[in-house]
Amino acid sequence: MPKAELEYRTFGLDEVRAVADNNTLVGHAAVFNTLVDLGYFRELIAPGAFAKTLADHADVKALFNHEANNILGRTKSGTLKLAEDATGLLSEINMPDTNLGRDLMVSVKRGDIDQMSFAFQAIQEEWNESDPNNPIRTLKEVKLFDVSPVTYPAYPTTDVSAKSAENILAEHRSSIKFTQKVIEPIQEDHSATDSTTPDYATANEARRKELERLDIEG
């Protein structure tokens, strides 16, 4: 199966702040249960979406504008601390005593930088297409790569390094069609003895086995 591509989301928050006494930048890189319109669909992040990636002690970086050369901290060294709270993904960056670190602290204090973003891969998601023209994607589990104070927001429709919202929706709907194709024979087998349509759990299991088969054959 192809590896999931990186996606980016940005939240503008008044609470992104610089704590002068210990040179720390504090803010939420993600907010739970906030519906964001991405153009082709709406999206929200479920509480607990970051729980596994944090428990796995992934070496997450703190960057400026998602640039690898603009490193501000990392969890491995203890200069970046991440935790889920009632609001979302809280980040605390112990800013470096460098030109970038000092300048960024000044910009945050002045209010010139007031947004934070995060880079991730979607691991588990749910879709609600009760309104096909306005579907909702819920991120249930993500793999976190970096958090970043940003100058400009990075959304899938505007950032060329991320999957577009249109492609994400198309991939989801293609997956649904694949699932339907796999379970059609199952439905036919059951129809002779049982008129009950297989539930989503059955469909998902059938799709998982078929994908495993394709991986082995590939």
Question: Which stretches of residues belong to each language-model region?
Answer:
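Short glycine-rich, polar/acidic loop-and-turn segments at beta strand-coil junctions
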Residues: A29-N33, F64-A68, M95-D97
